[in-house]
Amino acid sequence: MKNIRRIGLPIVAAFLFQTSAFSQAKPLIELVEIPAGSYYMGSEGKGENFDEAPSHKVNISKAFRMGATEVTNAQYELFRPEHKKLRGKNNVSTEDDDAVVNVSYQDAVDFCQWLSEKEGKTYRLPTEAEWEYACRAGTYTLFYTGDGLSSNMRRNQTIARDYKAVSLKVGQTRPNAFGLYDMHGNVEEWCLDWYGPYSAEEQTDPVGPAEGEFRVTRGGSHHTPDEYLR
């Protein structure tokens, strides 16, 4: 689901994407290998929202590495220590290992730039096509857990919809087949792309429109309906 709706909390997270080879030094972010491959992006004939169609073939031509979890408060605050005063706003994201929230698109880009300079590698946000490919991890169902959420994911979403204080600790639910956590729910995740309609044609490494009004976020959050978690 290409989610740009204005949710009640400005909940976003920067997923890290690394295009260069690993160095011997341990990186700040745990990265997992995502192989090159092809998949069908979007959804069609399954009760999808208008902007999830048409389903179309996308080829990801090169393997890449992606953060195993969403960026945490502790990780982000090495870059921007003053962000700590925003912890706990609206009863979420209070602990070091909670996913960082209250991060704008530009904040996410700046964090990737800072980390690139710090580690001597190239980090950036994923494109929407890369994000969905990584999330699906070879599946063709509505979620990587099947056509419904796992019981753990369901419990987190049910609690959160009461707007009570909830934990945004990363890695609370089982990862997908690629080893990525929290791709459905917890916090929304920024992508590089401007929001725009899908092509009906087969594409290779698409990057979205050249310009637009909104940037894409994917994965939904702890208090968005299931349809926004895709």
Task: Map each language-model feature to its residues.
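Intrinsic structural disorder/low-complexity segments
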Residues: 8-9, 21, 147, 160
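Bacterial N-terminal signal peptides that target proteins for export
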Residues: 2-11
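A short glycine-rich, aromatic-capped structural motif
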Residues: 25-87, 104-106, 185
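Functional-site microenvironments in short loops/helix caps that host divalent-cation chemistry
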Residues: 40, 44-46, 86, 91-99, ...
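Bacterial Sec-dependent signal peptides at the C-terminal "C-region" and cleavage site
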Residues: 18-26
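Bacterial N-terminal signal peptides
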Residues: 10-18
